[in-house]
Amino acid sequence: YVFLIQAFRDEKSISDRIKVLLNFPPAGHSALDSEIEKIEKVDNISYAEKQKLAIKTAVNKGILILTGGPGTGKTTTLKGILRLFQSEGLDISLAAPTGRAAKRMTELTGKEAKTIHRLLEVEWDEHDRPTFKRNIRNPLECEALILDELSMVDISLFASLLNALPLGCRLIMLGDSDQLPPVGAGNVLHDLIESRLLPVVELKEVFRQSMGSLIVTNAHRIVNGEKIVTDRKDGDFFLMERQTPALAAKTIAELYAERLPRAYSYSPLRDIQVLCPSKKGEAGTVNLNKILQSLVNPPSDNKNELNSGFRLFREGDKVMQIKNNYDIHWDSDKESGEGIFNGDIGIIEKIDLKSETAFISFDDRTAQYAKEQMTELELAYAVTVHKSQGSEFKAVIMPVVNVIPQLCYRNLLYTAVTRAKELMIIVGTKDEVVKMAANDKKTRRYSALKKLLLNDAAPAILGTTGI
């Protein structure tokens, strides 16, 4: 193997910490079946056998990967695990890689979830580089950590998180291995599952309440390489045939600005998201953002504007942070802090021309941006599928026309479809959708994590000078 030295250290650290966690299992629970039955009675539910297995494994083993597609009951299972941990009086922390994923986790569980960066209390070293206050010398105080969207977590962040876990801490990880790998290095979820060293429960059964959804049905059909269903007029999944990128862009603009708001009372800014395979081309994010900005947030004497880099931003614009920034200050009703992270989506509420600053709301937080910091923003009426990971939207519109071969693969289509909660519309050609769903080749990630997990000895680090 040839490694970047930091990548080796991260993967070796992950391997070592996982083995330590496996060596400190919790005491078994003697009356687990009766406790599960109590939860079923109180919540008026009936767990499937795989869900019961996941709950028992989480409690008895103390470490678990829970994976499965939409509609398979991951959230219901998570709530059961959470209830049992709470009944044991454990101090529980919930975390996710992005602000939106953490917010969704909070809404689903009723317990506050934090981003991994917030949980680890990010701070800065003398070179103004991010470090974490919580680490192996100053571990977290939780007795159980539940981590969602593991597929998005790269090796660097996962290594930092594991190093901050105290001995004996239970670790429950949720993710969907059919989604895209993280933007950063590694493929943690895939490698952990492939190692077969950790307990893994995969939920496959789609529950009755989800079976009527074509979004759920087609997501599973895509994963299995099957033909998707698009001919149900009463469904929540539609394909609008358009043969060229120009025609697709025109249709997307109409759907976003007029047809969906009129038919479904959706807010273009808050409820509808265009997800593109690529930035480039007439049906790419750059062109679509210009079109959609002109339609839903046109110039006005009442709206201040600010140029930053080559981008024009206007009050009322939907924007996305495109890199982690640990310096930007934000305030919410409950607290204040620093840090706006890659993939966070917000609305420009106000631009102060005198000070050349913008005030941007990111869900429940408001951040103040200086003009030079706005170079880290892009318009977000349309974003790439990669940037949408960890988010959900009421309605998703996706162009699938003239997709370049490097992006014409199954897990990109699957990731886009699983972002939609209520409505999914593909604008393009059926042939390309079929081609995309049939291509199960995944972006190859070069990693030694699986090998490190399975081997007791790691290769020596040679020739590290200058790496």
Where on the chain are the PLM-derived regions?
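N-terminal pre-Walker A segment at the start of P-loop NTPase domains
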Residues: 33-49
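Conserved helicase motor core of SF1/SF2 NTP-dependent helicases
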Residues: 57, 80, 84-90, 97-108, ...
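Residue-level recognition of short, solvent-exposed, well-ordered loop/turn junctions
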Residues: 166, 314-315, 341, 388
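C-terminal accessory regions
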Residues: 224, 333, 342-467
